[in-house]
């Protein structure tokens, strides 16, 4: 992609790891992002936590397993993961490690099914917006918060948007029909999708 296009990238989000305590010993932990895992690993509880884990995304799974954690289920997005819990694990207690800008999918699904859970804010996400001129031909988005950050000082305009998953795409669809969603929540696949699009 870089050989054929001018590529500009910047961190649209600043992540601040937060100290946390566990309100109740869970049967299972749930991680929806790598940032939640990094906060968990920075906490002393990571050295003694032995309960099985469910997570969203292959890279989240890899980070957990690289640090000795047992992942029993990986989903492409939180809605898929909650559906799995509702069907197979309704009588368990879950702890969701998340950020301050989390989407309501986990809590809504658990409440709807009457499943016991707690949520811990393990990190804070701060938006870092920057004006982009000229208007890019393509925009790669990795989270709904990234979309929100970009829109603080920019508009989608005629740019083609590439989203890492359906959750991120949901934040973009009201704004444009020029949209491609990565087949999996994987950064390399997203870049490949953009490269393929602009080689046409």
PLM features: what roles do these ranges have?
Residues 1-200:
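Signature of uroporphyrinogen-III synthase
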